[in-house]
From Swiss-Prot:
Encoding gene (name): gag-pol
Name of the protein in question: Gag-Pol polyprotein
Organism: Cas-Br-E murine leukemia virus
One GO molecular-function entry: zinc ion binding
Biased composition (Basic and acidic residues): 432-464, 484-496
SUPFAM superfamilies: Acid proteases (SSF50630), DNA/RNA polymerases (SSF56672), Retroviral matrix proteins (SSF47836), Retrovirus capsid protein, N-terminal core domain (SSF47943), Retrovirus zinc finger-like domains (SSF57756), Ribonuclease H-like (SSF53098)
Keywords, sorted A to Z: Aspartyl protease, Capsid protein, Coiled coil, DNA integration, DNA recombination, DNA-binding, DNA-directed DNA polymerase, Endonuclease, Eukaryotic host gene expression shutoff by virus, Eukaryotic host translation shutoff by virus, Host cell membrane, Host cytoplasm, Host endosome, Host gene expression shutoff by virus, Host membrane, Host-virus interaction, Hydrolase, Lipoprotein, Magnesium, Membrane, Metal-binding, Myristate, Nuclease, Nucleotidyltransferase, Phosphoprotein, Protease, RNA-binding, RNA-directed DNA polymerase, Transferase, Ubl conjugation, Viral genome integration, Viral matrix protein, Viral nucleoprotein, Virion, Virus entry into host cell, Zinc, Zinc-finger
Amino acid sequence: MGQTVTTPLSLTLDHWKDVERTAHNQSVDVKKRRWVTFCSVEWPTFNVGWPQDGTFNRDIITQVKIKVFSPGPHGHPDQVPYIVTWEALAFDPPPWVKPFVHPKPPLPPSAPSLLPEPPLSTSPRSSLYPALTPSLGAKPKPQVLPDSGGPLIDLLTEDPPPYRDPGPPPSDRDRDDGEAAPAGEAPDPSPMASRLRGRRELPVADSTTSQAFPLRSGGNGQLQYWPFSSSDLYNWKNNNPSFSEDPGKLTALIESVLLTHQPTWDDCQQLLGTLLTGEEKQRVLLEARKAVRGEDGRPTQLPNEINDAFPLERPDWDYNTQRGRNHLVLYRQLLLAGLQNAGRSPTNLAKVKGITQGPNESPSAFLERLKEAYRRYTPYDPEDPGQETNVSMSFIWQSAPDIGRKLERLEDLKSKTLGDLVREAEKIFNKRETPEEREERIKRETEEKEERRRAEDEQKEKERDRRRHREMSKLLATVVSGQKQDRQGGERRRPQLDKDQCAYCKEKGHWAKDCPKKPRGPRGPRPQTSLLALDDQGGRGQEPPPEPRITLKVGGQPVTFLVDTGAQHSVLTQNPGPLSDKSAWVQGATGGKRYRWTTDRKVHLATGKVTHSFLHVPDCPYPLLGRDLLTKLNAQIHFEGSGAQVVGPRGQPLQVLTLNIEDEYRLHETSKEPDVSLGSTWLSDFPQAWAETGGMGLAVRQAPLIIPLKATSTPVSIKQYPMSQEARLGIKPHIQRLLDQGILVPCQSPWNTPLLPVKKPGTNDYRPVQDLREVNKRVEDIHPTVPNPYNLLSGLPPSHQWYTVLDLKDAFFCLRLHPTSQPLFAFEWRDPEMGISGQLTWTRLPQGFKNSPTLFDEALHRDLAGFRIQHPDLILLQYVDDLLLAATSELDCQQGTRALLQTLGDLGYRASAKKAQICQKQVKYLGYLLKEGQRWLTEARKETVMGQPIPKTPRQLREFLGTAGFCRLWIPGFAEMAAPLYPLTKTGTLFNWGPDQQKAFQEIKQALLTAPALGLPDLTKPFELFVDEKQGYAKGVLTQKLGPWRRPVAYLSKKLDPVAAGWPPCLRMVAAIAVLTKDAGKLTMGQPLVILAPHAVEALVKQPPDRWLSNARMTHYQALLLDTDRVQFGPVVALNPATLLPLPEEGLQHDCLDILAEAHGTRSDLMDQPLPDADHTWYTDGSSFLQEGQRKAGAAVTTETEVIWARALPAGTSAQRAELIALTQALKMAEGKKLNVYTDSRYAFATAHIHGEIYRRRGLLTSEGKEIKNKDEILALLKALFLPKRLSIIHCPGHQKGNSAEARGNRMADQAAREVATRETPETSTLLIENSTPYTHEHFHYTVTDTKDLTKLGATYDSAKKYWVYQGKPVMPDQFTFELLDFLHQLTHLSFSKTKALLERSPSPYYMLNRDRTLKNITETCKACAQVNASKSAVKQGTRVRGHRPGTHWEIDFTEVKPGLYGYKYLLVFVDTFSGWIEAFPTKKETAKVVTKKLLEEIFPRFGMPQVLGTDNGPAFVSKVSQTVADLLGIDWKLHCAYRPQSSGQVERMNRTIKETLTKLTLATGSRDWVLLLPLALYRARNTPGPHGLTPYEILYGAPPPLVNFPDPDMTRVTNSPSLQAHLQALYLVQHEVWRPLAAAYQEQLDRPVVPHPYRVGDTVWVRRHQTKNLEPRWKGPYTVLLTTPTALKVDGISAWVHAAHVKAATTSPARTAWKVQRSQNPLKIRLSREPS
């Protein structure tokens, strides 16, 4: 037996468990495959001597580790865990590694022990000192490090042994080498020594003293080793933070240990291993090795120098020599440098900025925290004088607001040092008022403010009453004087005054009381008017009586009316809205004037129901309640001592409600039970709990909230949107109220978001809404913990039927915001009246912030936790700010409500008294109506759904389904009912609303009207789930027992996925139960569930058939349904389809396992064993392989010795498709016979026996809802299975080497398939499906009309072959011709001429009867073409510069495609002007970057670098980026004429062609996915003949387009495919025979250009107006032509050039010209002038 060679790599693989354990100890994870790859492939390439079989050499491992840990792009971070694990195996080897680890070389013997010389003096900047020499009289200690071969150490001895074996005393030469510096001369300090933190110089200890350091002098004068005690290491590790948390503190600790303990190399490793993690230690060692400096004082990269100064393995330093001690000192210095460099975290000034002074934090303590932040998060030293300015600014800006503001106002701030700022801050801090003083001051200011406001209100009220009394007195005096004048008759009246005219001086602009001409002397006692002097006993005497007033609600706003029985009509003073054309004259004290009535009828409710309109009189001093409205209200006015009271006929105060006329019908509805109003005792007993009495709330137990931002977020500033004056005035009172309450405060912030005024429906009131979408994007997301309303009521037992519902008012405003987070929510506001012009921000949690609901919900849960503990018998449900309290009795509900209100008041929350529902048996909560342990849909919810109109767009349909989906628990079978609606919501689907959709729409609405009541889930009782399945839809009802009845809890329904929908009924029931059980779990909360269904599915779940279910689905169903602690199966029941509840009679029993066993493929007698009496035994095979870079495929049907059928398949055909085609062909050829067919394809065998039927049942869809591959071939195979009389499909192994019949037949079929794929060239056809039956002569059926037409043509009938022959070809009947041409047109939508040209280029093997007539009829009647094609326009054809060969001259343009899809909105179109070849790329933007990207990545690699590019003057083409790229590449970029699309005619025409084709394809396919249809449009454009009869495909590739090649019935006659050389020769001929004539034709057009326009200089033309107005001529002018170009004209009177297409000739009528002769001063000259006719 041979021996196996063991290598380090194989050794680790044999002990892989130990390797993984070692990796886990290093906090890393390794994989075996990558372990082998790195060891054998990666690390040998590092050129450090790593063998492919691995090694445990520590030096080589260290070199590899350095390579792996290299910073920047040369490092290998993915290999770090593997080299760290390998290093751990080498440095701490397990038993199976130790034999492979290289032993350490023995330490050289040291010199004899003598007193060491005094150590060299260190640099003043150094903080590390050599070991101290002890005195000679030191007591010897027992040994610590024994000899490797000696006995065990006696730890109880007194003195330790020396650290190294004693050696001979150093000679002079040794002293010169190791201690070269003289005794009195200190060596140069190392570069690292000057950089260490320690800068204090300690005196050199006396050689006679001894200290308890790890290296200390022994009794023999040598340095002895004292190890660290375990207690010291334990204390250091546990009393200090980790290196990752606070590297500075741990670095200072290690520095002090290095200074005081003088540790050796081994001690340093022990210290690092204890205080640092493995990863931190590796990072420190790597940084220390980087700090090693060479002889020139710069960091070196030489490995030998780095290993000498900072070795990774134990060095052989002799600490009794000066050389060894110097090495140790340098090692400690480098170690400290590594600690400092590794501890430097990346600069994060945001962390520094986040340090702010606390409310009660002293300035000195804050400064220390600020400096510590600078040390931790920046590389700057805060003690550095150069950083003092930055620290000072941070100290000022991040101090408390009051301290920061005062520090900013200090004089000569620049000259202040940090110490001066701290002293000033301390003074300000010490002068702060105490909390008690602050509360007292705020209370005093509040009282003073309230007192001032109260006094002002009283003064205003007194002034208002005085003014009203004075006006009423004037009115009554006027009435009295008028009556007196009427009685006197002959007395002259005073002249009538205007409303702004003075009654004293008759001047306008002031009244008599303000008249400057009126004497102001002391007034005498006024005589009392007899009419007003009332001699009443015990009355008011001469005091004015109180005016009768009543406050009514008009239009939702309270209006206080003055009851005036003398007024005929009621009056409003403010504008109530639009006014009608109806008006009336009103006679007042100052004269008469016409006023208008209100437009809208108003409906008032008092004791009765009345309709009324008001008179709008703005000049009236007070709104008046006249006799018209008082009469309708049956009002009664009582005069009492306290004043007049206006009541109804029953003595109750009048309550008036105003609403629009369109809501008048609601007044005639039947009255409902009156709601129990909130009693006054609840308001008075708990004033702090209500928003109406307690004011704005404040959660006293919640700390201010800090809103964390994302790491990369920056402030966003969005300007305020324009706001109308009406909206600004509407939200102004709200802003003022929030400012007075302190919820809004002025601020200055870099953040700003706009304010949106939202008008409340039905009123003129606005409310401010802030657009915080940009702020939400920049704030960290938190997990939402708001309860799900779907199952929130599951925690409400039906036994609790007394409810209290509270809605917290302004809930979010109860939580405070931290001052650091307040600037995030700033917005702009200007109010000149209040003196505000700047920003305001929120001091409370704002609305519109994405995390507000979660933050408030959690805060309220914490505050109400105590209430829940104290009242365990009550049920308290909380959904954000909506509270539901439930109890079993009215008394418990009242007591619990009182306790809850008291708790809310104490906590600082406020409830809305208007929305409160106190101790009722029927309440509304979260859109549900709760009553007697059941939940109902509210009428408002039903009306919302019923009021929605028929959807017109997918968005409206989604809104309807979302609203109705909220109510799906009340609708049995909602998923099945809404099935016709969901396909219309998909993107890219045509919205075609048909009868099915209308029926589903109405059924959902009808189901809502009959929605039943659902019981609340009782978690103390088990649940029953009745499940049924129908046509792929799962339906069920979740019930609970209520006495002898079953009460529904929820109706569940869901559509099964495409895979489950294709199963047999029994398995579909299993899927339905699984789906509904999962949904029911949201309501049952894990309580026991009994499943009842018409199928016995428990046995199916326990033993599911592997034919139908995958392992993953089987495991899922079993884990969900076989949980016996939660799910149980009941007996089989028959369900009522309407109610889904069990019927009283039993249903038909069946065995699901037996039915599934009988469920076979489409043919029940299909066998997989050979038939003994078969007529044929055939072998099929399909082959697909790569040859010369092209995938070739073929299929064959053979016997053991001969080929029955063989065909080459199109290039790219897969092997699975070829196998299906071969098997299908064999079945077709064996029609009506007994057949044994062998196939070596498991795919074809399984499809025929098992999977084909499964695919058919589920609609040939995958689990993702997409079509399966080879759909058409599978359908053809399933259809062909029924053709043979008897059939057996047998699977045989492929590529057998035996001599059996199966092996020979299989080899024959495989060889035939490969040969036919190599020998024959399949004809490409996109018009006919590969597996469809081609037209043959036997399928031709001629009609009488066909026979007549053929007789006229002179065709002959072949009676033997049974078809007509004309021109030597079989004649295709008219119907066949129509079907073929119609199918061709549906694919291409080419015109009549283009399609005819294609058919004539490559004649068909058949003669198509009436081809031209049929084709013309098809193209003319095509609906898609008629909707898209533009009408013809007679435009003269011009000439265009083209390239001389393909790929040299391109035209480029962007065209927009609507609607956008997947973000793509544009098409970038490239057209080769020579060949007409088109390239089009969907793009998301229309930029120069997109143009250059496609040009360099698509055009250049495939067609070469263009020479000329032609574009319009779009921004993407004239930009500097595009032009610069063109200049660098040497491309001549030609910009076409502006506003002239014809100059880019070729690409513009192609844009139209693409859009038309895409439109036709979307109409034909019903899909809106134009990105998916774009390749078909490009295929059509590339294969359409051009002006010269050649297609772009032919010009470019030299081959006929694949569109015109129809399949020949006899495929065996196809010639062999040409070789590569023949193809190249054909291309060469194309270049000479096609490209050169085309180039010559293009050049000939250029040589003979067409005259672009007939206009010449001097002609008169009209110029078109581009924008015409109403009744304005379309043409302007005429103008005279001054200059011309081939495309434009310069005319007199217009500065710009005018395109020739925008002008037309002006015809002038001949006019008779008259000339006049005049003399001049020169007798030899005369003047001729033309007179106008």
